Amino acid sequence: MNKTMLSVLLLSSSGFYTSQTVWAGGEYIANLPTITMQASGDNIDPLNGAFTASQGTITQEQIETRPLSRPAEVLETIPGVIVTQHSGSGKANQYFLRGFNLDHGTDFATSLDGQPLNMVTHAHGQGYTDLNFLIPELIHNIDYHKGATSVDDGDFASAGTAKIYTLHSLERPFAQVTLGNHDLLRFLGVGHIKINDGELIGAFENQSSDGPWTNPENLSKQNLFLKYFKGDEDQNTSFGLQHYQAKWDATDQIPEHLVQNGQLDRFDSLDPSDGGKSKRTALWFNRNQRADREFSQFSAYAVRSELNLFSNFTYFLDDPLRGDQFEQAEKRTLLGLKFQKGWSDRWYDKEMLNIVGSSLRYDDIDGLGLHQTQNRQRFNTIREDDVKQTTLGVWGQNQIAWQPWLRSIIGLRGDLYHFNVNSDRNENSGRKTDHILSPKFSLILGPWKNVEYYINYAYGFHSNDARGVTTKLNVDPRDENYLQPLDSVSPLVRTVNKELGLRAHLIDNLTTTLALWRLDSDSELLFIGDAGTTEPSRPSKRQGIELSNFYQLNDWVMIDIDAAWSKARFKDSSEEGDFIPGAIEKTLSAGISYKLNDQWSFGGRLRYFGPRALIEDNSVRSDSSTIVNLLASYQLNKNIFTQIELLNVLDKKVNDIEYYYASCATQDFNTGACAPGSAEREGISDKHIHPSEGRNLRFTLRYLF
């Protein structure tokens, strides 16, 4: 067995994918020191190391040349991912991928320097992923793959995984200021110092903005980041500290009929007191080692977060006098450890790589509350809980190179969950333990004529909110079944991923990937955060096709074109229909980056977000949206850098998000469906829309020291 083949084994098992640099943020070991690797400069050959077609790495250069309207849009560098918002800028974004409306993160696992960012049993929704504390200028790379195809994939990874890594070194300190429409003002300062043969990077960010909304957003955001890194490719240690805080006023979605009849402007609000405040403080530690033919990785993290979120989606449907605003609140302490070890061996003269690992996570959530409010003042508590949730994951994986053109990967993951809920109603308190096993299999064939083929079959899962696991009584006074018994739901839900794909390198500098996939879920269990109950939904299936192209035309031009089509349906038959509301169907993304010379560079992006069913019978569908963003940068001299971003260049009047449900605004009180005291008062079913911002200009001035 030659060294190149063993290198392929190590790369694929260590998470190094297409077009990824060997030194990915200094946090992850790629190959063993005794093994050579096919590479050009710092880039691994695109055909080496992948275990599925739908994986890759986003580099710092790709992020720098992409116009961004919000931090979480760095995930849109992943083919097929759409990032939207239906509320204020301090709230977690809404994500779409592979036939999923992922809500605020369910079924897409995201991490930052080893810290999991999906929150279990969250006040607003299971898997809540707030990325507003990201500083895009500090991102070194993003590793991603679709489907729960790796043994490293645990909870929330059924649709995919994104691992974000920050810089471990800084070329030059800088300070920059960004000005934009709607009183946008952002300051960012980044510096570094050498300490004991290592490097400490520090950054501070402050941002304020009112947005285009009639009711100004009054966003105030502060971010402090510190990271120390010491070591090299053989062994390295890093630890970091980050503190983030934000407060904002939100404009939630509004009924479309009130916009169409002229009673509301697209940017109006029906409850100006919506909004919130959020805090997050994180400590983390990473240690990586390799020696001869083995490697090990250890990480630990501690996170303290707080959230108070005020929302009103139905306005005056439930309470014609005080309105329907509610508060979701929590204070959380998150602790965790992760260890992974790999070693190479031979089995009947075949090169083999084995990996074992384990992770432990503990969430201690206090004051997990759902409260009825008016103008952010509580007047009733629907429920309040203290939750302690513990998760243990263990896994093992074996990879064998049977032939130069044939590799197999077999893995098994086990997860154990313990839920402990102390509710304000004893009927809804309780403890529950559950476990699940997730086998995974991949077969990699080729390359033949610069084309490599992949077969993946993997079991995954997602957990349900702990409150849904122990709830036995409906405590929502707004519901007609108030104080009626409820069935508790299964803690863990099985998913199955299947994928066939290829990765081609048919001409120089062009990488093309094609994936045909299917994902089955036993149940779309959903905890309704604004009701305090869990709604078990129906089993589902999703399938689709993804095509991605990345072309490095030369040293100064990069082009990418990605298209995805998905079909999402409930498996069982029902009179209401089998469409999954909000499920993404079609997306298209295209971009170009052009570096004219050492001074000028340009970037452009087009994003198409196709129409989708908003209710089960597909009789109501959302509109599509197409947005074009542009970026131009100019290096005036060695110290001064300028950049202009023009967002939504065509000034398209499109919506960021659309829903369909019943509500009552005061403007509707003259109708029977919304008249206070009316026996027919059930609300007006309509699309509810949250618009994208119009044309938006931003200017950045950076001084490099």
Model-derived segments and spans:
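Membrane-embedded beta-barrel scaffold of Gram-negative outer-membrane proteins
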Residues: 288-290, 295-313, 446, 452-460, ...
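Short acidic/polar hinge/loop motifs at secondary-structure boundaries
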Residues: 116-146, 164-165
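Extracytoplasmic beta-strand/coil segments of soluble accessory domains associated
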Residues: 72, 76-119
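N-terminal periplasmic "start-of-domain" segments of outer-membrane beta-barrel proteins
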Residues: 33-66, 91-94
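Face-selective signature of the C-terminal outer-membrane beta-barrel domain
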Residues: 236-244, 276-424, 444, 506, ...
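Transmembrane beta-barrel wall of Gram-negative outer-membrane proteins
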Residues: 174-208, 213-251, 274-293, 343, ...
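Gram-negative outer-membrane beta-barrel transporters
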Residues: 342-344, 511-521, 536-617, 700-704
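C-terminal beta-signal and adjacent terminal beta-strands/loops
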Residues: 63, 611-612, 634-705
